């Protein structure tokens, strides 16, 4: 399907370009969001008449997006989630979740603006882009942790999963050492008992003799 773009679309073209796209992409995204028109003679004539106005409006929207983006660009947002010891989440964090928490900061963001290829399923710091406008993107960090304390440790650069694994190994080593010591003590006591019993038996034999 041939369309004329009304704004820049990433990996497709800029305002005024006539492009060929799949019908589904046109009907489900470009046309309903007002990013393009069907490239008919009537629409092309209409576009040329309104081109200057469209370009001015697009520049204004880009400026507004850039201004609002200053409040979140480079910021970190904490999300507390349940997860196993391996760091795997019980569930996932989606673009909708991210849009909601970022919007709480005062900058309105919708899920379609979140550049996320797949839901996030692990703890940690996840850097991603938010496309506030075709010409304006900002970068944020999503800090997913099991507690506020863990989030602060991650923000400070600590690998909490590796730290937890080290702690678990240290505990396991300590428990193994305790068991080994207990086993050695048990063997010593058994040896002492055996020696005592042998000595008693020798004394008994001497008495009988």
Swiss-Prot record:
Write one Gene Ontology MF term.
Answer: rRNA binding
Superkingdom assignment: Bacteria
Q: Name one GO cellular component term.
A: ribosome
Biological process terms in GO annotation: translation
Q: Which InterPro entries match?
A: Ribosomal_bL9, Ribosomal_bL9/RNase_H1_N, Ribosomal_bL9_bac/chp, Ribosomal_bL9_C, Ribosomal_bL9_C_sf, Ribosomal_bL9_N, Ribosomal_bL9_N_sf
* Start-end of Acidic residues biased regions: 197-209
PROSITE patterns xrefs: RIBOSOMAL_L9
* Region annotated Disordered, chain positions: 181-209
One Pfam entry for this protein is: Ribosomal_L9_C
Q: Which UniProt keywords apply?
A: Ribonucleoprotein, Ribosomal protein, RNA-binding, rRNA-binding
Q: What task does this protein carry out?
A: Binds to the 23S rRNA.
| PANTHER family, alphabetized | 50S RIBOSOMAL PROTEIN L9
Q: Which family does it belong to?
A: Belongs to the bacterial ribosomal protein bL9 family.
Spell out the protein name for this chain: Large ribosomal subunit protein bL9
Source organism: Maricaulis maris (strain MCS10)
Q: Which gene encodes it?
A: rplI
């Amino acid at each position: 399907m041939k369309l004329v773009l009304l704004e820049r679309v990433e990996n497709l073209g800029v305002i005024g370009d006539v492009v060929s796209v799949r019908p589904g992409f046109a009907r489900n995204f470009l046309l309903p969001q007002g990013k393009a028109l069907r490239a008919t003679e009537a629409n092309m004539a209409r576009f040329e008449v309104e081109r200057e106005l469209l370009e001015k409006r697009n520049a204004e929207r880009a400026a507004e997006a850039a201004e609002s983006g200053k409040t979140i660009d480079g910021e970190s947002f904490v999300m507390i989630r349940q997860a196993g010891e391996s760091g795997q989440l019980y569930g996932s964090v989606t673009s909708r979740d991210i849009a909601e928490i970022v919007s709480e900061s005062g900058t309105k963001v919708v899920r379609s603006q979140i550049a996320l290829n797949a839901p996030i399923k692990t703890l940690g710091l996840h850097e991603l882009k938010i496309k506030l406008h075709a010409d304006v993107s900002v970068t944020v960090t999503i800090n997913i942790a099991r507690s506020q304390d863990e989030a602060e440790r991650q923000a400070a650069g600590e690998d909490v999963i590796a730290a937890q694994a080290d702690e678990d190994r240290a505990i396991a080593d300590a428990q193994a050492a305790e068991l080994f010591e207990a086993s050695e003590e048990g063997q010593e006591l058994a040896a002492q008992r055996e020696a005592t019993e042998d000595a008693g038996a020798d004394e008994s034999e001497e008495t009988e003799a």
